[in-house]
Amino acid sequence: MVNRFLRALFYWPIRITATCEPIPFEPLKHIKIDPNKQIVYIMVSSSVGNMLTVERLTKQLGWPSPFEDIVIGQKKLPRTAYLRDPTFFGSTGRARDISGTIFQWFAASREINEDLQIIPISVLWSRDPSIEGAAIRGIDLATPVWRKFLTLTFAGRDNCTIISDPCSAFYLEERLKSVGDYILRKIMLNRLVALHFLRKARTIVGRPFPNRSRLLHELVQRQGTQSAIAEAMEKDGKSKEELEKKAYEIFDIMVADTRYPLLRFFNTIISLIWKRIYHGQSIVGANKVRNLVQNGYEIIYIPCHRSHMDYILLLFAIFHEGLPIPQVASGDNLNFFPVGQIIRRCGSYFIRRKMKGDTFYTALFREYLSVLFERGYATEFFIEGGRSRTGRTLPPRTGMVSMTVQAQLRGIERPIAFIPTYLGYEHVMEVGSYMHELEGAAKKKESIKGLFGIFKRLRYYGRGYVTFGEPVIVPRFLNKHVPNWHDYIDPTGNSRPEWLYDTVNQLSHEIMIKLNDSASVNAINLCALAIIGDADHTLSINMLKRCLKLYLLVLSCDERRKGLMPSGSLDTIIAQALELKKFRVYDVGEDMKFVRPSRGQTLQLTYFQNNILHLVALPALIASVIIRNGHISRADVISHTRSLFYFLKHELFTPITEDELDSFINKYINVFVKGGYILDLDHNMLALSGDGYEELLILSNSIRLNLVRYLIAVTLLRQINDGTLTRKDFVTACVDLCKEVPSEVTNNSPEFADPIMFNIMCDTFVRHSYFSYSENGTIIPEHNKIVKLAQAAEPLLAAKLVRHLKTEIEKIKSHNVLGHEAAKAAQAEAAAKRTPEAEAISATDDKRPIISNDSAKTENKTHGAAISEDKIESSAAACEDKMQSVSEFLDDKDAKS
């Protein structure tokens, strides 16, 4: 009766002043509820404010109200058990025997043999961890009435409601039976419940933020800093006082100054902006991070870097999932007024973008990182260094990973866990400027003017995607790769074991693989993959649906993609992609509808295609091998795919290990067979099916430019002699050759000649012994291996293109004797003499088989069961003619509009 009166009295005041933000952010996706079992609740306090907040949330989730009683068999019992009752002045409240109600649930459920779902729920009225040395707020077991009144009045909208996973009543009862004495069971149950709520609250609130002034002085006096100062004194001859002052100034620029009120304010602003420009967000994997935090791991978020919006998206996800708020590494280019001071108070620390050569600065930064790790603060940094202009994951910058491993080698007790975090978008506001930069435009410096320019571009951007991937645990990784790493622990931080460099590179590569493995696939990614894969970038709606169906079949082969792919029908996926206006639908009459990129959007679609290219690279390569043969044995498909996949794997950080490769190749082949795209004939022979040729061709085109780059590199390597080219010269020559490839092949893609791709390729060549370096840094090719690689790559591309590349290489061979500038002049002269015929090179002709003699013999026996190559050629030609006429019609329509 009293509860009903208080509920009626305080319902509207609490409804107005308080929120009920749940943790996890989307409970129904993460909390598994059995609809056939009744629900009961365990709460910290019987406070009316807590009860009304929980009631509001349970109503949204479709769960019963905590105010209602529960009927179990013939018994009517309270649905909610409480740990404490609030008092007016007491800080901890009055203890209640929670075990009494729980034991009643046990007895009643046993009588009718029906299990109950016990859900612990707690309400935090402040998430402010405060500053070191101050009292921690928000974790009290039961807030007194007077403080609750003030909290509701001034900070009621800062609360969060923590929902734990349900526990079976039968299971809990069985666990308690191991304690023989009834009194001990009651004591243990009360303690377990109290400990559970306390751990949950501390996980959400996190550690108190460091006192910046105290931390600055402490950093200067630490042993590592003093050692760096002593080395600098010997090297530069400066006094200790001068260097200590310099160290203090560096730390003053570097160290964060996190303030919770500002974080909370910006979270409110971010939430408002987010709801305006994004149509929701998907957050996956937060439970893994919460479990690591509760088990005492040091958390380091490693997000991919796509946009300046990454900071906002990740902070939104972290805040709303109740994860530890990190200290974020930011480049010193963002430390300008007033942005620098604002983001510093939001948890950013500023570092130079290039530290190489400055041992003093590097030592100081290493010391600051060690302090953060030792004290248990979560951190965040972008392992790619800068934003990706192409949409692909960039090669890792290993500096901070190395410092992290060195911090672990100091002997800190907390194991460090890297959390690869994928951030996905349906639109990136900077994508237009990225395309200009790839074409050669200068990068614009960050400024306050540029910041205001961002607000002008705020519009509908689709959906945001955050995926917390599988963690990479540093001690576990070291145990696997360096079993005796404990022998190198040095509390001074001076440990530089000889295995550090290689191990850090392997660790960084592992992080990138896990990062790409957590990629979310959205509608715009899939549609871009199909549209850009077509030679004319024009598809009928029906063909687009068929391509999407193939992509979804291929992606669903990997169980790790579960929960990371778009749901809904193919029409729904296309409708979601059309919302972004990156391509349009044209009705050409007779119930024929076609899609093609909107004006100026073709290059931007390549960016979103590249976001998921690593997920379809292997099936696309398999499709290429099968298409170029028509008939081929399964064993030959595996062999040819293996020979080229290593380059795709290292360039795209494809998340498939060596042990999994053959299994995945067979899985994708089976999907093609089951979907009717290819035929599985006798004697393990595979052949093209007439129905699925176009979809396979579009899929294979997604990696065509990658194969062209490999062919450029391999063809150049075949022409050079030992010791005539350095790595830098080789990359430059490859880039120059890329610029000579006709636009009909490259689709004017500015990323095609990106030097980063060829630098990654060089690493792969060295890793797999295709070439090595001499003492003076020049390339020494392994010609036998390179010839075999060329023989695998050349048949997958047009013969005219192969001949054209060889001709161009002959023209620039003078580079070796004339030098780079003279070679450029020679290239310019050769380009002026090029005939128009050399430009007209098709990327899809000359389907020369690459099968073995045995496969060819088997082919003759099975020729009648599969589509003939003549039919493939005529089908492809008819398709191209039809699409050409449609493309011309749409061009005319665009011109008129």
PLM regions and their residue ranges:
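Membrane-interfacial terminal anchoring regions of lipid-handling membrane enzymes
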Residues: 1-897
